[in-house]
C-alpha cells in the first residue's frame, strides 16, 4: 500500500510560518504570512512528523513496534499474526489471517488517503517470488544487479566465478602513491561501487559480504589492486545475478538459527590486529 501525500499528514510541535504561496497572495494583506497547521513538503520536520503520526495511529490499532527494527510492527490475536513494514510512505502488510489483513487496510484507509497496490511484487529494488503450492518465497535483486553493472560499465565484462581471488593480500600500502596514481584513482568511483555492492549484501547476497568488507577498508586511498578486487566482485555478481534467497516450507528449519565463527591472531598486515568474524542464518 502507498500513502498519498504522506508528509501532509504530520502534526507540528512548534509554530512555523511561511510566505504566502505564489498565485494565492491575499490582495488585502500581501505582507502577511501563513501559519502552518500541518507539515508540508520541504520542511526539515516533514519526514519526522509523518513518521510520528503514523506510529501513533498504528499503535492505536493495537500494533506493537519492534525494538530492533523500528519500521516493523506486529499485532497478534490468538493464533492470528499480522506484520506491517513501513518504508517512508510505502507499506507492506502480511499475516496468516486474511480478514485481519483487510481490517488493517480498512483502518489505514480511514486515517490516511491510501492506494492499494495489490500483492507485493517489487519493493526497494527487490523482486518477490512466490510458489504457494510449495510454500516458498524468494527475494531477488536481479534488476538491481543489472542497474549497477550498467551504471559502472561492467554489464559486458567477463563473468566471475568467485567474489574474491583466493589468498588475495590487500593492504593500505597498495594505495595510490604517485601523483599520476592519485589522479587516476580520483576518476574511479570506488566508494560508490563499494556502497552499491553493500546494499546487495544487506538484502539478498551474503555470499559477497566478506569481499565487500575487505574492499570497503580502502575507500580513503584505494589503489589499482583494490579497484581490481572491486571489479571482480561485480564480475561475480554479473555471473550470479539470478541467484536469490529462498525461504522454505519447513518451519523447524526456518526458525532454527545456525551460527559459525572464526578468528585469526594478528593477521592484519597493516596494524597486526587480530580479526574475528561470524555469520548467523
Give the role of each language-model region.
Residues 1-281:
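Long, low-complexity, charge-biased intrinsically disordered regions
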Amino acid at each position: 500500500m502507498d500513502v498519498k501525500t504522506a508528509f501532509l499528514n504530520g502534526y507540528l510541535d512548534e509554530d512555523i510560518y511561511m510566505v504566502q504561496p505564489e498565485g494565492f497572495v491575499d490582495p488585502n494583506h500581501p505582507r502577511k504570512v501563513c501559519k502552518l497547521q500541518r507539515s508540508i513538503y520541504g520542511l526539515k520536520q516533514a519526514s519526522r512528523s509523518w513518521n510520528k503520526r503514523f506510529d501513533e495511529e498504528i499503535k492505536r490499532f493495537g500494533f506493537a513496534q519492534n525494538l530492533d527494527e523500528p519500521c516493523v510492527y506486529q499485532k497478534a490475536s490468538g493464533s492470528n499474526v499480522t506484520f506491517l513494514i513501513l518504508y517512508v510512505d510505502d507499506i507492506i502488510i502480511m499475516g496468516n489471517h486474511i480478514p485481519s489483513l483487510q481490517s488493517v487496510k480498512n483502518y489505514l484507509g480511514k486515517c490516511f488517503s491510501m492506494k492499494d497496490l495489490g500483492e507485493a511484487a517489487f519493493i526497494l529494488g527487490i523482486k518477490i517470488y512466490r510458489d504457494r503450492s510449495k510454500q516458498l518465497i524468494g527475494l531477488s535483486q536481479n534488476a538491481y544487479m543489472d542497474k549497477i553493472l550498467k551504471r559502472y560499465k561492467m554489464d559486458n565484462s567477463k563473468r566471475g566465478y568467485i567474489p574474491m581471488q583466493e589468498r588475495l593480500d590487500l593492504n593500505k600500502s597498495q594505495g595510490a602513491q604517485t601523483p599520476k596514481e592519485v589522479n587516476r584513482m580520483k576518476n574511479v568511483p570506488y566508494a560508490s561501487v563499494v556502497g552499491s555492492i553493500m546494499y546487495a549484501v544487506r538484502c539478498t547476497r551474503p555470499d559477497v559480504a566478506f569481499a565487500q568488507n575487505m574492499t570497503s577498508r580502502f575507500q580513503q586511498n584505494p589503489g589499482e589492486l583494490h579497484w581490481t578486487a572491486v571489479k571482480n566482485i561485480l564480475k561475480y555478481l554479473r555471473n550470479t545475478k539470478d541467484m536469490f534467497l529462498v525461504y522454505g516450507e519447513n518451519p523447524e528449519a526456518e526458525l532454527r538459527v545456525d551460527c559459525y565463527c572464526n578468528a585469526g591472531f594478528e593477521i592484519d598486515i597493516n596494524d597486526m590486529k587480530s580479526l574475528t568474524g561470524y555469520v548467523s542464518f
